[in-house]
Each structure stands twice: as C-alpha cells, then as structure tokens.
C-alpha cells in the first residue's frame, strides 16, 4: 500500500522487539522468507537496532537492494529508555535528542535514510509532542526520513490535533491492538479519514480469546489455515498493517501466506463483530 507521503509500505511488517542476541539471525531469516518491511527502535532497553542493521546488511549482500526494503524505526523519549543505556544525551534539548537518536539509527541500520521515523509515544504535554514532531519534520526536510509516524497514541483528540497542527502530517499510527482500547475503532476511523496507515502490534499476544473463538476456528478449518492467519487476513482486508514478531521460520512462512487466500463475506462479518467492526 502507498502512504499519504507516497511511500510504499508492506502489508505485513516484521517486528524486532525483545529478540536480544537472536535479532540478527531472525531479521536475516525474515528477509530471506520474503518480508520486506522491518520495524525497530533506537531503544536498547527492548531492541538491538545494530543487530537489525547487521541482518539487513546480510540481506543486501544476497540480491536485495535498499529500495526493496521498508525500514522503520522510532525515537523513544527518555521516559521509555533504560537510564543506564540511553542512545542520546539525556541532558540535551528535545530536538537535539531526536537528532542524536536519528544519527544513531542511521549508523545502526547502515543506511543513509529511513523510510519512516516514528515517535514512540506522545510526550507528557501537547507542547512537547509538537516540539518533537517539528524536530522530526526537519529530518524529512533534510531528506534523511521519507515519512513520519506516531506510536502508542490512543487519544483521538491528540491525533486529530497533530494532524491539524503538523506541517508534515503523520503517515503511520502504530498501536497495541487489544480489547481494552476497543480495538482502536475511533483511532482507526480517524486514520481512514486522514489517509493514515494504521499498524497493529501485540495483535496475536493480546487476543487469545479472538484466536480461540469459533468464528475464527470455523474459517481456519474451511480454509485449511491457522487461526493467526485468519486474524491477520481479516486485518489486511480492513486496512490494518499487522506486525509479527515470531521467532519461528515456519510461522514466518505462514504469516506471509495470508496473501494466498480470502475470507468469505460471512467470515469477515463474523470476525468483524468480535472486534466491534460490525453490529
């Protein structure tokens, strides 16, 4: 799919959080199996961004070229960092923190541009969030970043304000996809109105009750597919880009196979009702 910024974004992304020493191997495997979008963050607490870069470099040495890939990383505010391992000067002004984090990401990922830079979470105040966004806009102006996004944004009012106030509007929203937020129905509606790509994480982990539901099981049985494949297929048919962080090559293959089948209209309605998408 193509974003409002004109950037091609794969319909399924490989997420690299919490992979630690296995990061490089798993990124190599994901790209070898056919993933073309990688999500990471400049946040040593949960991501090994340099090992993501090593895995990408290996793939680029086996026939892929940089334009074949969609590399998305995040600026993580100080509140989300391990204070003993912050990838920028925590005493620096916020715009400088963002600039330092961006430069670290370029080094880690061994690239000279990012396809998307995501603000990992809103800042404590709207003023700070807009200040961070303007610093990120300057990186787009300098052609180091192709588009911008925001993560962990569950407030439709905040997202709407950002869309109005930003000079470069968000192209991506990435949120946890779970029942506690009503599956982000309000946020997703705003994303549709503003032509923002909605990305979901914790899509499987947070939803065992969906995966175990008879509506999903019946579709999986009819199609000869797994419950995760059915849920992912429903989401891509409904303008959601899921992240998968599987460590299993077999599951990587299953995830990529969601493009090989379609749900029936009755199955879409039944699963949609579970997520509140249909009455």
Where are these regions (language model features)?
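Beta/alpha (TIM)-barrel catalytic core signal, keyed to glycine-rich beta->alpha loops juxtaposed to Asp/Glu
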Residues: 121-279
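Structural motif corresponding to the early beta-alpha repeats
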Residues: 66-95, 120
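Short, acidic/polar
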Residues: 19-31, 91-109, 156-160, 183
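N-terminal binding-site loop/beta-alpha segment at the start of enzyme catalytic domains
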Residues: 1-69, 73, 131, 206
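Short, well-ordered amphipathic alpha-helices
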Residues: 50-60, 102-106, 136, 159-163
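A structural motif
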Residues: 35, 111-114, 145, 170
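Active-site groove signature of glycoside hydrolases
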Residues: 106-126
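Active-site mouth loops of central-metabolism enzymes
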Residues: 10-22, 83-96, 126
């Amino acid at each position: 799919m193509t974003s409002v910024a004109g950037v091609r974004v794969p319909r399924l992304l490989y997420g690299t959080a919490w992979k630690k020493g296995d990061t490089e191997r798993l990124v190599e495997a994901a790209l070898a199996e056919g993933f073309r979008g990688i999500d990471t963050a400049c946040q040593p607490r949960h991501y090994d961004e340099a090992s993501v870069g090593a895995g990408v470099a290996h793939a680029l040495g086996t026939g892929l070229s940089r334009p074949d890939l969609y590399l998305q990383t995040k600026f993580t505010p100080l509140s989300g960092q391990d204070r003993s391992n912050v990838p920028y000067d925590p005493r620096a002004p916020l715009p400088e923190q963002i600039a330092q984090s961006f430069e670290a990401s370029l080094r880690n990922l061994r690239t000279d541009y990012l396809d998307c830079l995501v603000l990992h979470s809103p800042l404590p105040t709207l003023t700070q969030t807009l200040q961070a966004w303007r610093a990120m806009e300057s990186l787009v102006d300098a052609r180091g970043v192709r588009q911008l996004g925001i993560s962990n944004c569950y407030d439709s009012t905040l997202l709407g304000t950002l869309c109005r106030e930003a000079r470069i509007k968000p192209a991506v929203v990435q949120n946890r996809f779970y029942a506690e937020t009503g599956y982000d129905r309000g946020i997703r509606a705003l994303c549709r109105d503003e032509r923002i790509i909605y990305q979901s994480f914790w899509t499987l982990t947070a939803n065992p009750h969906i995966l175990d539901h008879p509506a999903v099981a019946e579709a999986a049985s009819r199609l000869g597919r797994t419950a995760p494949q059915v849920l992912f297929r429903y989401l891509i048919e409904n303008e959601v880009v899921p992240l998968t962080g599987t460590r299993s090559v077999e599951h990587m293959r299953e995830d990529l196979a969601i493009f090989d089948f379609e749900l029936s209209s009755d199955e879409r309605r039944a699963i949609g009702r579970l997520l509140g998408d249909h009455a």
